[in-house]
From Swiss-Prot:
Pfam families: OST48_MD, OST48_N
Family membership noted in the UniProt record: Belongs to the DDOST 48 kDa subunit family.
Membrane association type: Single-pass type I membrane protein
Keyword hit for Endoplasmic reticulum: yes
Lineage: Eukaryota, Metazoa, Chordata, Craniata, Vertebrata
Designated name of the protein: Dolichyl-diphosphooligosaccharide--protein glycosyltransferase 48 kDa subunit
UniProt-annotated location(s): Endoplasmic reticulum membrane
Length: 439
């Protein structure tokens, strides 16, 4: 080998580990679609919070002809952020169908709209059970608007009481009022997967702010959604915000006070804390569960048998972990149930936490067949947790039955009494002589 070639080989040898380490250390790949690149500056605090948590952000305009989510059947990104409400046509090979396929593949999507909403976002919302109001409409509330509103009462002050009662999604800390300006949404009542994360007050409605009301508004009162979410059956997560301004630096740092006399003034909104909590949930930093080792055996044994016997006393245990700050830690829950199912559950009982795992002892039913130990945990804000272990339950062997059954003692007594009676009758009958008749 020539000296120059050897030197290059040694240089590559020493540089390869750092390069591989940098690749392995890169965070979740996230594509950010913007109306224009100025949004990077006006929403810098939100994007900085993502970068500080290790996200690898790729900024592009929504009409960039080089856009691509899927290449050769593989997803190029883990997450998608759409901060381009007015887009009419996505660039490259991205469209509503590819975004839907991205969600079907388990991808996470964060969408922010505005009153200038275009057809693609409206169509994407319909695919997820969300219906946006018409273009140029806005959420209006004549009783809960900010003191800095310009007169159309579209700068809404949303109370935290209207937030979804799910700390995993909206955060655990108490928040200041939320500042919102944007388009309203309604949820498809036939879609049970839609989450009403932030609703309007009972006095809010969605309509054209510069026109008199001539027809019933699209959304009225508590049915008006300001922020909505979706967790699909494959645990993919999507969040729709009717306001792009909700994520802006100006709304994060703004003071907030309702225009009603005597209203309390807050030096800062709760937008930043809520936006961070929502991003942690939608990008699966919070509320992610997984199943660890599962074991089952007869009480007093350590290994599972080839088949259980009816009425056996068994012990079942399962390890459930939760993702927290990038690490898997034991999950803490008191409402996890175990079902012992054939076609319908024969046993349903709560699992108790013991030594880092959940376990329970119970007696098998006096029914044989093919059963399943099943844990099906589906709670608001958490990924769907499912574990199923199939086992066989056989009847008692001939030598395992009791020789005498206590409940049959009366029948035993009747049989032996009949035998004894027959024996006595036979003796009497055989040895009794009839008296001879005298003349």
């Amino acid at each position: 080998m020539e000296p120059s070639t050897a030197a290059r080989a040694w240089a590559l040898f020493w540089l390869l580990p750092p390069l591989l380490g940098a690749v392995c250390a890169s965070g979740p790949r996230t594509l950010v679609l913007l109306d224009n690149l100025n949004v990077r500056e006006t929403h810098s605090l939100f994007f900085r919070s993502l970068k500080d948590r290790g996200f690898e952000l790729t900024f592009k305009t929504a009409d960039d002809p080089s856009l691509s989510l899927i290449k050769y059947g593989e997803f190029l990104y883990d997450n998608l952020i759409i901060f381009s409400p007015s887009v009419e046509d996505f660039g490259g090979n991205i469209n509503v169908e590819t975004i839907s396929a991205f969600i079907d593949g388990g991808g996470s999507v964060l969408v922010a709209a505005s009153s200038d909403i275009g057809d693609p976002l409206r169509e994407l919302g319909s695919e997820c059970g969300i219906e946006f109001d018409e273009e140029k409409t806005a959420v209006i509330d004549h009783h809960n608007y900010d003191i800095s509103d310009l007169g159309q009462h579209t700068l809404i002050v949303a109370d935290t009481e209207n937030l979804l009662k799910a700390p995993t999604i909206v955060g655990k800390s108490s928040l200041n009022p939320i500042l919102f300006r944007g388009v309203g949404m309604v949820a498809d009542p036939d879609n049970p997967l839609v989450l009403d994360i932030l609703t309007g007050s009972s006095t809010s409605y969605s309509f054209f702010p510069d026109k008199p009301i001539t027809q019933y508004p699209h959304a009225v009162g508590k049915n008006t959604l300001l922020i909505a979410g979706l967790q699909a059956r494959n645990n993919a997560r999507v969040i729709f915000s009717g306001s792009l301004d909700f994520f802006s630096d100006s709304f994060f740092n703004s003071a907030v006070q309702k225009a009603a006399p005597g209203s309390q003034r807050y030096s800062q909104t709760g937008n930043y804390e809520l936006a961070v909590a929502l991003s942690r949930w939608v990008f699966k930093e919070e509320g992610v569960l997984r199943v660890g080792p599962v074991s089952h055996h007869r009480v007093g044994e350590t290994a599972p048998p080839n088949a259980y016997t009816v009425t056996d006393l068994v012990e079942y245990s399962i390890v459930i972990q939760q993702l927290s700050n990038g690490k898997w830690v034991p999950f803490d829950g008191d409402d996890i149930q175990l079902e012992f199912v054939r076609i319908d559950p024969f046993v349903r009982t709560f699992l108790k936490k013991k030594g880092g795992k959940y376990s329970v002892q119970f007696k098998l039913p006096d029914v044989y067949g093919v059963f399943q130990f099943k844990v099906d945990y589906n709670r608001l804000g958490y990924t769907h947790l499912y574990s199923s272990t199939q086992v066989s339950v056989r009847p008692l062997q001939h030598t395992q039955y009791e020789r005498f059954i206590p409940s049959a003692y009366p029948y035993y007594a009747s049989a032996f009494s009949m035998m004894l009676g027959l024996f006595i009758f036979s003796i009497v009958f055989l040895h009794m002589k009839e008296k001879e008749k005298s003349d």
